[in-house]
Design a protein with these regions (language model features):
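Conserved catalytic/binding loops enriched for acidic/polar residues
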Residues: 119
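Catalytic core regions of nucleotide second-messenger enzymes
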Residues: 9-11, 28, 95, 131-137, ...
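Active-site core of bacterial EAL-family cyclic-dinucleotide phosphodiesterase domains
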Residues: 37, 48-105, 142-145, 170, ...
Length: 207
C-alpha cells in the first residue's frame, strides 16, 4: 500500500500509516503481487457514505421519517380507490428529502430492511387508525429487493399483520421496487405465492 504526504495538508505519521493500510487492503482485494496507491477522493466518498448511513440510523431512532399518503383515483368515476404510502425524510439540517436522495445508498445495506420494516409497520398502524374511524382504505407500500429477499420476509410480514387484527390483509398491496436487483426469480415467485396465500396483494413494479 502506497500513500504520499501532501505539502498542502498537515499530516502526521499515524494518518499516513492508516492511509497506507487502506491502500494495502485494496491491493490484496485486487489479487496477488499488486500494489495500490491511496485514493483520497475515494476515501472521502467512503467516509461520506458511512456518515450518511449513521444519519439514517439516527433518523430511524428519532422519528425523522414520515409517511405521506397519495390518493389513487379511478379516472372514470373519480372515486378514491386507495392510497400509496410515500416515504419522506425530515432531515434536521437539509429539510425534506425524497427517497431518491437516500434509498439508493442503502439498497445493498441491512439498513434497507430496517427502513422497509419501519414503512410497513407505520403504514399498517395508519390503516388501523383509519379502520377505527370507519375508513376502509387499501394502501400500497413499496418494498425493496433486499427486504423482499431477506430470509423470513413472509413470516415477518405475517407478524406485522397479526399486530393489527382488525385489518383485512387484502387491503395491503406490496409493490416491489428494483426488480433488476432481484437475484433468484424462483424464490421471488415463491414469496409472491406465499404473500397471496395470506391475502396480501403483490406486484413487481417495473417487471
Amino acid at each position: 500500500g502506497v500513500t504520499f504526504a501532501s505539502p498542502m495538508e498537515e499530516m502526521d505519521a499515524d494518518l499516513l500509516l492508516r492511509q497506507a493500510d487502506q491502500a494495502m487492503y485494496q491491493a490484496k482485494l485486487a489479487g496477488k503481487n499488486r500494489y495500490c496507491v491511496f485514493d483520497a477522493e475515494q476515501d472521502r466518498s467512503v467516509r461520506g457514505l458511512h456518515e450518511t448511513l449513521e444519519e439514517i440510523r439516527r433518523a430511524l431512532l428519532t422519528q425523522q421519517f414520515v409517511l405521506y399518503y397519495q390518493p389513487k383515483v379511478n379516472m372514470r368515476t373519480g372515486a378514491v380507490i386507495g392510497v400509496e404510502a410515500l416515504l419522506r425524510w425530515q432531515h434536521p439540517e437539509k429539510g425534506w428529502l425524497l427517497p431518491a436522495a437516500f434509498l439508493p445508498l442503502i439498497e445493498a445495506h441491512p439498513l434497507a430492511v430496517e427502513v422497509g420494516e419501519w414503512v410497513l409497520g407505520n403504514a399498517l398502524a395508519q390503516m388501523s387508525q383509519w379502520h377505527a374511524e370507519g375508513l376502509h382504505i387499501a394502501v400500497s407500500v413499496n418494498v425493496g429487493a433486499r427486504q423482499l429477499q431477506q430470509r423470513g420476509f413472509v413470516e415477518r410480514l405475517a407478524e406485522l399483520l397479526a399486530a393489527h387484527p382488525t385489518l383485512a390483509p387484502g387491503d395491503l398491496d406490496l409493490e416491489v421496487m428494483e426488480t433488476r436487483a432481484l437475484q433468484q426469480l424462483a424464490s421471488v415467485s415463491a414469496i409472491n405465492m406465499a404473500c397471496r396465500e395470506i391475502g396480501v396483494s403483490f406486484a413487481l413494479d417495473d417487471f
